[in-house]
């Protein structure tokens, strides 16, 4: 079982893969989950729009699409992250790009752990959980 990082049509972001993978595992454990096979696919806005249209029938850009293959307490999935939208969100929300990237990385893991963000009040709960996870992000990743 592994956490893997790929770049689809862009360059892989400069993240500390080993430290980030350890952080992901630590966050998952706080929800009573173990990590299975998790693939991060970093891509452009155009690629994530293509994935959104093809698999979800959504015609818009987004920062992350999570395909959940979780079985029991072992989380697994493919997570597409648009680095273009991450950059736009960092500018929009006046946050550091690196922080926004790690927020997006953990956002997908939180979905795999069962946290939603579409219903009433769920977005706030998701943000609280993201903030809790970011608080334990290893210093070398900041």
UniProtKB/Swiss-Prot annotation:
InterPro entries noted in UniProt: MetalPrtase_cat_dom_sf_prd, YbeY
Q: What is its EC number?
A: 3.1.-.-
One of its Pfam families is YbeY
A GO molecular function annotation here is:
RNA endonuclease activity
Cellular component aspect of the GO annotation: cytoplasm
A single GO BP term for this record reads: rRNA processing
Location of the protein in the cell: Cytoplasm
| Gene3D superfamilies given in the database record | Metalloproteases ('zincins'), catalytic domain (3.40.390.30)
The UniProt note on the cofactor reads as follows: Binds 1 zinc ion.
Q: Where on this chain does Zn(2+) bind?
A: 107, 111, 117
Chief subcellular location equals cytoplasm
Q: Does the keyword Glycoprotein apply?
A: no
* Entry's family note: Belongs to the endoribonuclease YbeY family.
Q: What is this protein for, i.e. what is its function? A: Single strand-specific metallo-endoribonuclease involved in late-stage 70S ribosome quality control and in maturation of the 3' terminus of the 16S rRNA.
Q: What is this protein called?
A: Endoribonuclease YbeY
Name of the gene = ybeY
């Amino acid at each position: 079982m592994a956490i893997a990082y790929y770049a689809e049509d862009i360059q892989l972001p400069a993240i500390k893969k080993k430290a980030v993978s350890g952080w992901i595992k630590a966050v998952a454990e706080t929800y009573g989950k173990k990590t299975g096979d998790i693939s991060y696919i970093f891509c452009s806005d155009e690629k994530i729009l293509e994935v959104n249209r093809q698999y979800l029938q959504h015609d818009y850009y987004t920062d992350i699409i999570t395909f959940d293959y979780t079985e029991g307490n072992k989380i697994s999935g493919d997570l597409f992250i648009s680095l273009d939208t991450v950059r736009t969100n960092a500018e929009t929300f006046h946050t550091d790009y690196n922080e926004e990237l790690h927020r997006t990385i953990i956002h997908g893991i939180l979905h795999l752990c069962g946290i939603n963000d579409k219903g009433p009040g769920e977005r706030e709960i998701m943000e609280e959980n993201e903030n809790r996870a970011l608080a334990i992000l290893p210093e070398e990743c900041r």
